[in-house]
């Protein structure tokens, strides 16, 4: 059998297949002409052998076909009908020695039975379905399928494989020669003995040659089982069958037991004899006789497999899966316990192992792990892969049988199909005809071009010589071509060609001729298919014309060699190193490995894997901010200390400083223990933000020498310290030891300059930059203070490094570049993914607000665009207003998220935005930031400003490009961070040398040399050689040169000497431009100079003094002079005028600063007078300040004094030191300029004069050009003209602009007039007309056409000019309420809150509280079994025992559905969880205890919030309210809405009658009434009894009778409404009676209280009203308004009245008379009549009706819920806050009075806020919240009702009324545009709201 697949698939057999063998036998036996051929029954009688009787019925050919028909599945019936016990026995049991079938005792004769055969299709399908997938093996191509039926194939059938044979396991056992006693399970290389050993299973798969059997197996099958696959073998004698070929030989495509494929069996050319096959066989046969006879089976097996591979038919089967795609069962079996079989090794093996070395070569190779797991000893003794040696007693029989079978196959080879060689291209093409034996034969023929290129040059008419052939083929004509050559033939595998690999083929693992030894892995370094290392990338040398350059190179080669020898120029051998050179075959020196390599950008010597801390890699928030504002960006390189708002350090006072020595040692010990516990070695400790603290570990300080480094690491990022060392030539002592870092030996320097031999340079190196560092000694007096919120810590500092200039390795993206935008996008996406990962909900969800908070600069649309990729926005349901993760979206893993954005990308982005902010602060617009395109970059670099050129996106880009060799760096220039030439300027310059303007080189005279004696063409050869002798060139070298080579050397050497300033023959010098090589050399020298200088300066330990530094004032003087000149040219002013203006401006600025400083210090300033008039100003607040008074003399001789303020401490110290220690003479000398300074001044003056000349020249050019074209600039200026100053009234600036003349006069009143002036109107007309180009006025004859825009603009100007504007200061002072003078009440002040805030539904507030309690319970430990409903599949009997299940998720859903209006219902359901757990688990179970702890936590939380929850429950259900009036009104309102309005066809009575539709209604009906009006009265608490309520209800019926008549349908409906009302009142009679009594009692108590308060003595004033009659209906309103005055003076506490509880009283205050609250807001009282008349005048028509109508549209039942404010706190009602009680009156009279005057007035002005509280009392009632923050009363907020919210329009109207007060239409007209403006205020006075703005 096929040993390859045998090895591979026996693993699967041991695991899966042994127990599930098919019950049915395979059809192979019968189909192949076995003893039982059931197909024979169709054509005649069957003899005892199971074959057809007689020879006359069918001829031999038909019988052959008949034997093949067994493949139709008929053969499987025999085994079931006759031999059930075959499953346990072997096939050989039924076969006699001659191959005939024996009859058994229980055999039954079926010949006479005429029955319909049962349908066997199911069994056949089952058998077909049990085919195994194919498997290719590395060892052999003959495979066999086991006939077992895999369960997995039933569950999910694989793609249909090509049909393969199915054999019974019994056959395989006999074939493989396994003994019957159950010993022979065949194992692969490492496989454990399986428990399935009782059934011997041999599992194999099939390749394309499924039907072929190995020769060894074929012979065994014939000898042991007697089963032959020959046609009609069953009716022949055994000896006769040997002479016949088998059916598989005649028809290789035949499959025993399968459906016949005739096109495959009898295809065209199937039986054509193969010409070459017999010859091949004979050769092999001769060869085989010489070798061992065991190899016969190998060769024959390969031959048969090759035959079987021939197929002209293509099938649509799935391809056989390669072995790597099959399940690796070796792993499973290898992990199983292994029973060692090494003890079974024979003596032969021991003899072999004795000769081996002690340790086997293969034992510790790549497979060491597996050998260790199998327990293989070191010497490898006893290891046999589980193979077994061949049994010796059977060998002669097997050999003879194999030889016999092989001879038989050899004799019958003529009938076989074509061999495999016939399908090779070499046998199909007539390639012999194309061989050119003689070139003369094809000289006149044309060759095919594709073959000609392969054949090489052949002489022909077209290509007579090799050169012509090369030109035709496009080859380079030169012989010294540098391109590498490759062989067209693949490299031979020596093992395949010369090795005995066929000896290692495993034909039978159970019968091995010898045991194989594991091979030793060897890699051939010469194998081109092996990639042993990553090859270096070679940059292609781009050149336009290589051929020209090569010509120049060859022609100049000699002169170059000579010049190189004389030292004029240097030969650069490494320039030609980039291209591979043809190596001299005799040069064995390997010089190319010793050449210095070109240094690339990332010269990472040694490993450079940087492992950042986990918080940095995860981009956690504080370390990697998502947004940085301008202030943070300005402080990016120098972050200030954070001010703590809480914690110990937020308070002033002494704070202790803790040492850290013990903490450091303790932490080090802990980390060492952790390292040891993990097995020692390196360990990564930076895992949490706490690990990043400086309170433990080793610390070093690194001070960056650059002010604004191009790249800065964020907190938590790592860097390496590398110690670069360059060895000395010869004997090197090695690198000196360093305390920090790893030593790296480098030949080429990773910096711009190279290291000297023996030099060591330390460097920071990470993925962002490489920078040299220089260790300095830390002064002993220095230490480190670590500040946290809790306190200070101190620790020692050991070392400090100075960091040199960075060499960027990471490019900073430019603003708005694609890389920057991509980073922003990915950063946002990563943030969103992490938010989803943090979400605890399922499905995961997040809110948009969380993202907008982190990314405030992002638009919502861009965030939404990122979110839509992974989430959906839910508008309804439980997840409303959440973004929920899509169900089909897979969140990226942490590794994938980290790969999206790296910390280095963030750092580069931060560097970019910080630099962008610096440029914006410097005044550069965004257009100057854009990074240029590649092509224009060098030109662009020359044009942009120096500041932009130094931006990090330009410097990093330039440095990286320079390191790649694309350009050079400027080295010295504007981008030098030191500013003094000690650093590199990273600005691009081209590789080619350019003439610098400021080059100090001696320039040759620019004159033509043609025809002069300097013309080199006229120089004779003799004179030229003479010149060379003068230059010192040896004579023998001169003789070697031709004429023009001599001239070339003369020119070069003359140029060199002329450039160095010497040499008499400078006339022959040509060109001052350096060559590229010289330019590169100069560049390297300059880089080296600066590099050495930087190393010297930064490593210097010399202490520099700052005292001797000169002041920078002189430089600023020069700048001022330059600015003055420019201003003089622009403004045509003299220098004296300019200086005066500037001094005046400085004086004003200084004055303003002093005023500001004085006001800020508020009296803390103290003045220290000094003899030198040095004043320290404001030293306590703003630091020291030096004021220097200088005396000047103007042109007229008058003296004046100016004060100069200096704030720099260093300048102050220097000035004071000089003043106090030196005399006047020294100071006078000090002030005089020295010689050097005068020289600098002269240079500066010359520069400024040159600038002046240039400006004049430009002006003259402009004059010559003529007047410039006019450009429409008005379009740009128009937006500015729309601005109007609020201070001075001018147009074009705002009041905050410094150009405003009133900018510094902050307290001066604005000077805007009452109406617009004519000038302002004209300015306004200019701004209003927008389009200048459009013709606004057209004249057509006598007709003038005015544009529509003109008329509209005129109307607008007219309307705006009529608007009166009143400044705040000119308004009459508003009346403020009296404030208590006691200081101790300051803490009662509350922040200002708007009156008309939106009210929150109390159900929402209650639900949010309950949900927070659920969250707290869910966070308790071990509560997860109660989080979700019990799974019925897991706990099957739960729902049989528990009838009312409950869990936290269901509880949360109920809360969100607003199903719990009170605490009791919520707690009841929670208690249900405890009861259910006790019922199912038992009361003592741990789960029951956990649920009880949840209930206890809930009770605790409910107790904490008891007051708030009680208020919310009362608001939800007013019947729970302590105020009886609220409950009474609630019942009445329910009667109206749920009963009376529910009467059918009652809609005409729901709202007032519309006057438009029924014009005469209000003439007939004097007192109209409807259900809506009744509801308003209810909401205003106008009904204290049922009688008053019924009066209004009956009035509806009476009005209907009066207007419609008693018989009208409307009247009947009204009667039904009244009946329903009476009926419902009867139902609630008992409850309503009790409420009426309580209301009456409370009313009487209030009246008594009012009488007591009215007796309080009070001095009457001019505005103090006399207390009117309480029962007078006309004065009741004013009494209610004025009564609060008495109450204000009384200072009575609410607690003084025993008749009501505090809660009741506070709510009663809200329901008291209409005027109480209004007057409480007002604080002062007016005359009652005056107030009514005044407000009557200011009444706007229908205002109250509109408010009432608008307010009632939004909810049917205003009492269904009382809403509290969103915060939910609202200052508890029952807290006993001191609030004055207000008097009570007869409510009915008051309310009737209010009702009568409703159409006449509304309360506005100062009492406006209260009036809305009263008139819209259906919106808000209860306790009132006052807006005045200075109020000493503790108040509660209004609550709205039943999910009822004030509409936004009403809010705006009410706020506008309160802000602007009453508006008298006859006097003031407010324009539509400016009604909302803050400049407009009421005439009567500002409201309280305005005073707080």
UniProtKB/Swiss-Prot annotation:
CDD domains: Bromo_TFIID. Autophosphorylates on Ser residues. Inhibited by retinoblastoma tumor suppressor protein, RB1. Binding to TAF7 or CIITA inhibits the histone acetyltransferase activity. Residues 197-208 have a biased composition (Low complexity). It holds the Pfam family zf-CCHC_6. Changing residue 712 to I: In a lung bronchoalveolar carcinoma sample; somatic mutation. InterPro entries: Bromodomain, Bromodomain-like_sf, Bromodomain_CS, TAF1, TAF1_animal, TAF1_HAT_dom, TAF_II_230-bd, TAFII-230_TBP-bd_sf. Keywords: Acetylation, Acyltransferase, ATP-binding, Bromodomain, Cell cycle, Disease variant, DNA-binding, Dystonia, Host-virus interaction, Intellectual disability, Isopeptide bond, Kinase, Nucleotide-binding, Nucleus, Parkinsonism, Phosphoprotein, Repeat, Serine/threonine-protein kinase, Transcription, Transcription regulation, Transferase, Ubl conjugation. Transmembrane segments: none annotated. Its main location: nucleus. Phosphorylated by casein kinase II in vitro. Residues 1397-1505, 1519-1628 form the Bromo domain. Residues 1830-1840, 1860-1869 have a biased composition (Polar residues). It is an enzyme of class 2 (transferase). There is a cross-link at residues 570, 583 (Glycyl lysine isopeptide (Lys-Gly) (interchain with G-Cter in SUMO2)). The Bromo domain mediates interaction with histones that have acetylated lysine residues at specific positions. The second domain also recognizes and binds histones that are butyrylated and crotonylated. The TFIID basal transcription factor complex plays a major role in the initiation of RNA polymerase II (Pol II)-dependent transcription. TFIID recognizes and binds promoters with or without a TATA box via its subunit TBP, a TATA-box-binding protein, and promotes assembly of the pre-initiation complex (PIC). The TFIID complex consists of TBP and TBP-associated factors (TAFs), including TAF1, TAF2, TAF3, TAF4, TAF5, TAF6, TAF7, TAF8, TAF9, TAF10, TAF11, TAF12 and TAF13. TAF1 is the largest component and core scaffold of the TFIID complex, involved in nucleating complex assembly. This is Transcription initiation factor TFIID subunit 1. It comes from Homo sapiens (Human). The lineage of its organism: Eukaryota, Metazoa, Chordata, Craniata, Vertebrata. The gene is TAF1.
């Amino acid at each position: 059998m096929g040993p390859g697949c045998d090895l591979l698939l026996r693993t699967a057999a041991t695991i899966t297949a042994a127990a599930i063998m098919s019950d049915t036998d395979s059809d192979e036996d019968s189909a192949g002409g076995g003893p039982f051929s059931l197909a024979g029954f169709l054509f005649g009688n069957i003899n005892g052998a199971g074959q057809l009787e007689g020879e006359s019925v069918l001829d031999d050919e038909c019988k052959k076909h008949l034997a093949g028909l067994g493949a139709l599945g008929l053969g499987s019936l025999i085994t079931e009908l006759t031999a059930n016990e075959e499953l346990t026995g072997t096939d050989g049991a039924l076969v006699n020695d001659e191959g005939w079938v024996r009859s058994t005792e229980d055999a039954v004769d079926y010949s006479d039975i005429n029955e319909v055969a049962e349908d066997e299709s199911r069994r056949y399908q089952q058998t077909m379905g049990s085919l195994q997938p194919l498997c290719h093996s590395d060892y052999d191509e003959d495979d066999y399928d086991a006939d077992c039926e895999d369960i997995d194939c039933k569950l999910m059938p694989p793609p249909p494989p090509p049909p393969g044979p199915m054999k019974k396991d019994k056959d395989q056992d006999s074939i493989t020669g396994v003994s019957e006693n159950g010993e022979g399970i065949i194992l692969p290389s490492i496989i454990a003995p399986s428990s399935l050993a009782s059934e011997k299973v041999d599992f194999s798969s099939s390749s394309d040659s499924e039907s072929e059997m190995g020769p060894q197996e074929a012979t065994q099958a014939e000898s042991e089982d007697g089963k032959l696959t020959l046609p009609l073998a069953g009716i022949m004698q055994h000896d006769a069958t040997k002479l016949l070929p088998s059916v598989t030989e005649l028809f290789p495509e035949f499959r025993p037991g399968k459906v016949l494929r005739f096109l495959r069996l009898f295809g065209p050319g199937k039986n054509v004899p193969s010409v070459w096959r017999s010859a091949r066989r004979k050769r092999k046969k001769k060869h085989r006789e010489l070798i061992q006879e065991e190899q016969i089976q190998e060769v024959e097996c390969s031959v048969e497999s090759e035959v079987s591979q021939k197929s002209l038919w293509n099938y649509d089967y799935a391809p056989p899966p390669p072995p790597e795609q099959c399940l690796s069962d070796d792993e499973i079996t290898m992990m199983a316990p292994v029973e060692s079989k090494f003890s079974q090794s024979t003596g032969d093996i021991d003899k072999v192992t004795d000769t081996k070395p002690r340790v086997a070569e293969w034992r510790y190779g790549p497979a060491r792990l597996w050998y260790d797991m199998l327990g293989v000893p070191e010497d490898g003794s006893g290891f046999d892969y589980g193979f077994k040696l061949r049994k010796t007693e059977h060998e002669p029989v097997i050999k003879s049988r194999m030889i016999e079978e092989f001879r038989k196959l050899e004799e019958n080879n003529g009938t076989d199909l074509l061999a495999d060689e016939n399908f090779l291209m070499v046998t199909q093409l007539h390639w012999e005809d194309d061989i050119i034996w003689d070139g003369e034969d094809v000289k006149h023929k044309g060759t095919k071009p594709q073959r000609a290129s392969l054949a090489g040059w052949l002489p022909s008419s077209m290509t007579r010589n090799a050169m012509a052939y090369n030109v035709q083929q496009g080859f380079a004509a030169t012989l010294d071509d540098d391109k590498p050559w490759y062989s067209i033939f693949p490299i031979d595998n020596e093992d395949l060609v010369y090795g005995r690999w066929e000896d290692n083929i495993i034909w039978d693992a159970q019968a091995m001729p010898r045991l194989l030894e594991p091979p030793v892995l060897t890699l051939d370094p010469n194998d081109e298919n092996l990639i042993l290392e990553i090859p270096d990338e070679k940059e292609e040398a781009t050149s336009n014309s290589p051929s020209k350059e090569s010509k120049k190179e060859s022609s100049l080669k000699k002169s170059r060699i000579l010049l190189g020898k004389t030292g004029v120029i240097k030969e650069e051998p490494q320039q030609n190193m980039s291209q591979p050179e043809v190596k001299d075959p005799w040069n064995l020196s390997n010089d190319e490995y010793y050449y210095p390599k070109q240094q690339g950008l990332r010269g990472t010597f040694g490993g450079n894997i940087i492992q950042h801390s986990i918080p940095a890699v995860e981009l956690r928030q504080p370390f990697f901010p998502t947004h940085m504002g301008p202030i943070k960006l300005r402080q990016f390189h120098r972050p200030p200390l954070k001010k703590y708002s809480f914690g110990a350090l937020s308070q002033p006072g002494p704070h202790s400083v803790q040492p850290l020595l013990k903490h450091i040692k303790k932490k080090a010990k802990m980390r060492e223990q952790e390292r040891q516990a993990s097995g020692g070695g390196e360990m990564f400790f930076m895992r949490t933000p706490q690990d990043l603290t400086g309170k433990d570990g080793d610390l070093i300080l690194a001070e960056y020498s650059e002010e604004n480094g191009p790249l800065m690491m964020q907190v938590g990022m790592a860097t390496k310290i590398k110690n670069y060392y360059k060895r000395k030539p010869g004997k090197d002592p090695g690198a000196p030891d360093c305390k920090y870092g790893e030593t790296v030996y480098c030949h080429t320097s990773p910096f711009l300059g190279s290291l000297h031999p023996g030099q060591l340079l330390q460097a920071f190196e990470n993925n962002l930059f490489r920078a040299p560092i220089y260790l300095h000694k830390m002064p002993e007096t220095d230490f480190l203070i670590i500040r946290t919120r809790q306190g200070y810590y101190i620790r020692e500092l050991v070392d400090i490094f100075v960091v040199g200039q960075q060499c960027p390795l990471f490019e900073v993206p430019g603003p708005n570049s694609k890389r920057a935008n991509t980073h922003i996008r990915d950063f946002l996406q990563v943030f969103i993914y992490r938010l989803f990962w943090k979400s605890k909900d399922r499905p995961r969800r997040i809110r948009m607000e969380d993202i907008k908070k982190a990314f405030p600069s992002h638009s919502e649309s861009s965030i939404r665009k990122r979110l839509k990729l992974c989430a959906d926005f839910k508008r309804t349901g439980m997840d409303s207003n959440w973004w929920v993760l899509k169900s089909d979206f897979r969140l990226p893993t942490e590794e994938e998220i980290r790969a999206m954005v790296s910390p280095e990308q963030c750092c580069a982005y931060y560097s970019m935005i910080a630099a962008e902010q610096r440029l914006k602060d410097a005044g550069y617009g965004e257009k100057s930031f854009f990074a240029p395109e590649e092509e224009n970059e060098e030109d662009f670099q020359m044009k942009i400003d120096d500041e932009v050129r130094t931006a990090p996106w330009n410097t990093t880009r330039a440095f990286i490009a320079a390191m790649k060799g694309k350009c050079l760096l400027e080295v010295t220039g504007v981008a030098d961070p030191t500013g003094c030439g000690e650093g590199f300027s990273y600005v691009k310059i081209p590789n080619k040398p350019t003439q610098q303007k400021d080059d100090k080189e001696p320039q040759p005279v620019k004159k033509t040399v043609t025809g002069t004696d300097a013309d080199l063409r006229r120089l004779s050869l003799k004179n030229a050689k003479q010149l060379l002798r003068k230059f010192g060139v040896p004579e023998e070298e001169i003789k070697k040169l031709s004429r023009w080579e001599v001239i070339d050397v003369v020119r070069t050497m003359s140029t060199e000497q002329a450039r160095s300033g010497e040499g008499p023959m400078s006339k022959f010098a040509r060109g001052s431009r350096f060559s590229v090589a010289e330019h590169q050399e100069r560049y390297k020298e300059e880089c080296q100079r600066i590099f050495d200088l930087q190393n010297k300066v930064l490593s210097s330990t010399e202490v520099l003094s700052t005292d001797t530094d000169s002041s920078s004032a002189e430089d600023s003087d020069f700048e001022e002079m330059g600015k003055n000149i420019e201003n003089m040219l622009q403004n045509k002013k003299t220098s004296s005028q300019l200086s005066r203006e500037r001094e005046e401006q400085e004086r004003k600025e200084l004055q303003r600063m002093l005023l500001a400083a004085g006001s800020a210090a508020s009296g803390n300033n103290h003045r220290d007078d000094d003899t030198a008039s040095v004043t320290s100003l404001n030293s306590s607040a703003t630091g020291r300040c030096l004021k220097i008074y200088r005396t000047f003399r103007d042109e007229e001789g008058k003296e004046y004094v100016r004060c100069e303020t200096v704030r720099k401490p260093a300048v102050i110290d220097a000035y004071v030191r000089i003043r106090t220690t030196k005399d006047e003479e020294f100071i006078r000398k000090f002030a005089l300029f020295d010689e050097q300074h005068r020289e600098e001044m002269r240079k500066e003056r010359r520069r400024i004069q040159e600038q002046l000349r240039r400006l004049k020249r430009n002006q003259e050019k402009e004059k010559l050009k003529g007047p410039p074209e006019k450009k429409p600039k008005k379009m740009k200026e128009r937006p500015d003209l729309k601005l109007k100053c609020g201070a001075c009234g001018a147009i074009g600036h705002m009041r905050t602009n410094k150009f405003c003349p009133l900018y510094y006069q902050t307290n001066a009143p604005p000077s805007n007039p009452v109406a617009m002036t004519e000038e302002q109107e004209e300015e306004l007309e200019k701004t209003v007309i927008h389009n200048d180009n459009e013709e606004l006025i057209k004249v057509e004859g006598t007709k003038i056409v005015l544009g529509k825009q003109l008329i509209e603009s005129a109307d607008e100007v007219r309307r705006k000019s009529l608007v009166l504007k009143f400044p705040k200061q000119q308004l009459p002072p508003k009346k403020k309420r009296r404030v208590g003078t006691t200081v101790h009440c300051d803490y009662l002040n509350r922040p200002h809150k708007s009156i008309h805030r939106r009210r929150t539904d109390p159900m929402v507030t209650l639900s949010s509280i309950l949900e927070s309690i659920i969250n707290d319970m869910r966070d308790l430990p071990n509560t997860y079994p109660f989080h979700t409903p019990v799974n019925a599949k897991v706990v099957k009997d739960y729902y049989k025992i528990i009838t009312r299940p409950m869990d936290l998720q269901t509880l949360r859903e109920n809360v969100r559905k607003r199903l719990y209006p009170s605490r009791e219902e919520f707690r009841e359901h929670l208690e249900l969880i405890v009861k259910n757990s006790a019922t199912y688990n038992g009361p003592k179970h741990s789960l029951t205890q956990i649920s009880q702890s949840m209930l206890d936590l809930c009770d605790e939380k409910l107790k904490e919030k008891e007051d708030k929850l009680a208020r919310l429950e009362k608001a939800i259900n007013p019947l729970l309210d302590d105020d009886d009036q609220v409950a009474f009104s609630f019942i009445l309102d329910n009667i109206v809405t749920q009963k009376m309005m529910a009467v059918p066809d009652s809609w005409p009575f729901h709202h007032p009658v519309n006057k438009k539709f029924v014009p005469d209604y209000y003439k007939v009906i004097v007192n109209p009434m409807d259900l809506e009006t009744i509801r308003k009265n209810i909401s205003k608490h106008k009904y204290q009894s049922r009688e008053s309520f019924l009066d209004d209800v009956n009035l509806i019926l009476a009005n209907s009778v009066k207007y419609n008549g008693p018989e009208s349908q409307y009247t009947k409906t009204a009667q039904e409404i009244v009946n329903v009302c009476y009926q419902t009142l009867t139902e609630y009679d008992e409850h309503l009676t009790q409420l009426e009594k309580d209301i009456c009692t409370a009313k009487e108590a209030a009246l008594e209280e009012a009488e007591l308060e009215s007796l309080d003595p009070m001095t009457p004033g001019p505005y103090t009203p006399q207390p009117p009659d309480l029962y007078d209906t006309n004065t009741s309103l004013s009494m209610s308004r004025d009564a609060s005055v008495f109450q204000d003076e009384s200072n009575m506490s609410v607690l003084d009245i025993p008749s009501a509880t505090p809660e009741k009283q506070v709510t009663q205050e809200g329901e008291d008379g209409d005027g109480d609250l209004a007057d409480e807001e007002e604080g002062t009282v007016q005359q009652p009549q005056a107030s009514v008349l005044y407000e009557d005048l200011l009444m706007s028509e229908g205002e109250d009706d509109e408010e009432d109508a608008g307010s009632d549209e939004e909810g049917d039942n205003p009492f269904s819920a009382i809403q509290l404010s969103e915060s939910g706190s609202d200052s508890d009602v029952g807290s006993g806050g001191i609030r004055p009680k207000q008097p009570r009156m007869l409510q009915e009279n008051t309310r009737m009075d209010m009702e009568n005057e409703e159409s006449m007035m509304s309360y506005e002005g100062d009492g406006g806020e209260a009036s809305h509280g009263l008139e819209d009392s259906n919106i808000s009632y209860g306790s009132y919240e006052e807006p005045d923050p200075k109020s000493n009363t503790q108040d509660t907020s209004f609550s709205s009702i039943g999910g009822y919210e004030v509409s936004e329009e009403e809010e705006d109207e009410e706020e506008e009324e309160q802000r602007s007060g009453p508006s008298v239409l006859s006097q003031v007209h407010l324009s539509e545009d400016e009604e909302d403006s803050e400049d407009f205020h009421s005439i009567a006075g500002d409201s309280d709201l305005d005073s707080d703005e």
